[in-house]
Amino acid sequence: MTNIPEDRIPVIVGIGEIVDRPKEIAEGLEPLDLLEQALRRAEQDAGAKLLGEAQSLDLVNFLSWRYRDPEKLLAQRLGISPAHCHYGPVGGESPIRYIHEAAKRIARGECSVAAICGAEAQSTATKAERAGVKLPWTPFAHDVEEPKRGAAFQKPLAVKLGVFRPVTVYPFYEAASSAHWGQTPREAMAESGTLWSRYSEAAAENPNAWLKRRYTPEEITTPTADNRLIAWPYNKLMVANPSVNMGGALLLTSLAKARAAGIAEDKLVYPLGGASAEEPRDYLLRDQFYESHPQNAVLKAAMDLAGGDGKSFDAIELYSCFPCVPKMARRTLGLGPDVQPTVTGGLTFFGAPLNTYMTHAACAMVRRLRDGAKLGLLYGQGGFVTKHHALVVSKTAPREVLVQETSVQADADRNNRAVPEFVAEATGKGTVESFTVLYGRGGNIEHGVVMLRTEDDRRTLARVPASDGATLAHLLAMDRTPVGSLGEIAMAEDNVPEWRVA
């Protein structure tokens, strides 16, 4: 038993989810509706009237609609005035951070009820725009600035070459990591297909998933008209699917308050602790692309909470915007290719309500622990392998007070090697550090992009024109990685470096 005061032990007591599939576009619920309903469902799940006492409200950033001060609008709808009322920045790790921070607030005695929620209505918003339907929602706040996303932090050459969006940046990690592990592109693709098929199996079992069907590895990795290549090696079925309408919420309280409210013990799930760390926002300022030092540090800290062994977790959620993320994560955790990487279904199949997927993953994890699992790992990630947060949750009450200082940034930074200087202009020999190939909607190659090291070991990006069939064939070969291969850099007429294989 623990000797921590029960009013300082945080517990997750309520989970709520809503999926909206309107028959008519105009009947679609706006994000504020989804948020409110998810929170009310979480309160219903807890079986105790807690929402009215919430002193902490964290709202995950959403992009499908814009409000002025959405956290205040939501608090008004709920009839509450929480001391901590927060609407955060963009980041797929943020739901895990908010759950962790709420737990810390309860452990400090600053609040006794905390709510975390997120929602997106991108499917309805997109359909309405395409059909010219005016939605009867809270008026769109055009005067509110759009939140800064990853593209805002990238170099002009990266933007010019099209490698400034998640779907075109993550392939750099995919190619570099698989080469580092000694895989051929064919082997790397097979691992992605098998892993993603496993995510789809979990989605097929999740009543809240957007796509409820199992996909075979071959269906996932084979390009077709419906599964087009977007950025090598990623097809549509390997990337996040943001066209969903979903809301998710969790309620936390103290163990003392949960017991006083008569909440059943079998409902309680305990946050044991976690960790966070970040990479530079500009991905070209990182030392390499075959691993992430912050990801490693965060997952190792989570393992330490589980006795130092990743196999101690009997339920895990590895963030899944693109295959390289859980592929890197499972190796750091010491887990094999037979890993069961999700309790939710993944951002492709469950759906990607942008920043708030991990809210749904946390709900699914609570269900899994209530159903018999003992120790769970929630790992969220944001940006371009940029922001990392892990949280360990348990069916058993903690033996130690929740640790307040949970950044492992120093551990991550300690492993940084020298970062090569970036140059926007280069000539001479160039060695491939990583690469991708960008495709148009019709399946045609637009151009390749190689990340290179120059002869004096500086870093640049270069284009491979669609007309250079020999170099593109070299990049797209399945039995030998082009990472590490040598070629010639020349400046094109538009002042962009171009690379041709030697």
List PLM regions with ranges.
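Conserved phosphate-binding catalytic cores of ATP/NTP-utilizing and phosphoryl-transfer enzymes
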Residues: 96-104
